[in-house]
Amino acid sequence: MINNSLTELFYAQMQLIRRTEQTFFALYGRGLMAGTVHTSIGQEACAVGVVNALDRTRDVIFSNHRAHGHFLAYCDDVEGLVAELLGRRSGVVGGIGGTQHLHKDNFYTNGVQGGIVPNAVGAALAEKHKQSGAIVVVFLGDGTMGQGVVYESMNVAALWSLPLLFVLEDNQYAQSTHRCDEHAGSLAQRAQPFGIESAETEADDVFTVYAAAQRAVAYVRRQNRPFFLVLHTYRLAPHSKGDDTRSAEELQRYWARDPLARLAAVLPDAQRAAIDAAIEQRIEKAVEKALTDEVEEIGDWRLEIGAHQSLHPPIPQSPNLLISNLQSPISYLESLRQSLHTILEEDSTALVLGEDILDPYGGAFKVTKGLSTRFPDRVRTTPICEATIVGMSVGMALRGLHPIAEIMFGDFVALAADQIVNHAAKYPAMYNGQVAVPLVIRTPMGGGRGYGPTHSQSLERLFLGIPHLKIVAASHLHDAGALLRQVVADREPVIFVEHKLLYPLALVRGEGRRARRETERLRDWRLGVEDWAPVRGDGVLQMAEGVDRFGYPVALARNYGDDETPDVTVIAYGGMSRLLAPLLIEMAAEEIRMLACLPTCISPLDAAPLVWAAAQSGRVLVAEESPAAFGWGAEVATQVHALAGDRLYAPVARLGAAPTVIPAAKPLEDMVLPSQAMLAAQVVKLLEM
């Protein structure tokens, strides 16, 4: 028997979705909207039927590019949605996200097909970890079922028994391509090999959808396991605004099955007219208000990472646990390992996940050894699924956890590029500062161990300059473990680069060395005599440490005294420190005074300490392990020339790997990668200019 109150409610919600989206088409026609719009006209029963089966006070939704219906059914914020698509400040995310990128409370969308699915898996893991009782729903379309990350996500959701409801809206088309030209077999059976229960139903009747959703939601909540619900529906409007290639006969056939018209037919005319009038008035007022609203300003925090207080951690009193305070020599590897233990001890929201990280193996490079024994519930080994490892971590971070994801080899970050670039780095600014993504991706980079072309690269270069993403690299002239603790405290996503050849090296120590606590700008960034300290056990090297304006340490090392100036400055980062430390000693023997500058936050880049270091000598070499062309060194050289060009005696020199694959054979690898001898030759060449 039909419930009259539900009939009225469902009709009002479906009509609100329909008329709002039709209004968007009208606004486009008037030239008041730009870009694109993806409507769900004809699919309203899916959104309304599923959302009304949820607990809006706690359940979480991840949706896709076609999310207006889900948003209105869940958030009931037509005013915020209209303003968003009109690009106004009062939009749900200030006009930044537009039609595809919406967020309010527990509702998230993104426009990349399939990308939201591992985010939803991570959110489900977070809710399970917090014991909130919430379930997570992820809406996806039939076209998205071609994405591999969807199946990675299903596997993990089933493996870890997560409270996640997959809702597949099968509208038969992926933009313009029909399902029969894209998928073999049954979509409804795709979840079964993972042991995920599934059901399917026609979605031309909202009560049928509602009943199916109620059963699915009850199962997920009761069993704490995923469920796969397939809703067979049809999109009656174009993919976007006017790109419909379907035949008139086909459209007419499905208009005759319109779920909204079917529901409207059972309501009394007067009741339906009253609902329609109220909806029209609400939409008209929303449009009128939005058109008089201002456009959001692009503030400094969106243009430059670290300038917005709510998205950046406070600079600690001692930004790096100073090496001079270490009680005994410690290796780069042990420093990282100890810090991971400390992080999990002190932060109950911190979780570590990655491939082969459990004891007794403890990870490919043994950084996680001992962690799973002490923290069995917060250290999770994963399948081989880099995109989902990072994607899950994004979802966990959005829901209040502090995930630390390990990618076994840095070369494999390419498999997670979409999650890093289009999800982790996008959400905070795309959602107008309403969320943070405190995610750390630890990964070993670099060559020198004979692992060959696909396990030896320095692919952090691929992510340099990505807005709202930090790349931090520790050398053995820094306390790597303390730096790891600092990036975990950061509220923005960080790729933490660990060089493989540094793991066994002892951290280089300076006696009495102290940190500078200011965040100084270009013309003020300098070090005084009192900041330098000799390296223990070495009569040549001295070290100092500064802090860039993002709060991250910058190590400096020199081979000359207080009353001298350097002949040359070498700027590098990360694993290059293993070459620079002995190079300083070699240059001292040749009576060449050298200053080495190694920042840790290599992107975004604070040029001030690098410019200061360059100006000390007027001759600068920038070195990196990846090929020099289009690399980090190019940006450093540009900044140095622009800001200190009048103090240079020669153009900035650059050194990087040869522009080819990194061979496995040791003699060939040595020919390709930068070496101490290559650095020395470049220094001598600079001094001859």
Label every PLM stretch briefly:
Residues 39, 61-64, 94-95, 121, ...:
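General beta-strand structural signal in soluble alpha/beta enzymes
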Residues 1-46, 231-232, 236-322, 329-375, ...:
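Conserved acidic/glycine
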Residues 104-285, 358-440, 448-450, ...:
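Thiamine diphosphate
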Residues 449-497, 506-522:
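Internal gly/pro-rich beta-alpha loop/helix module
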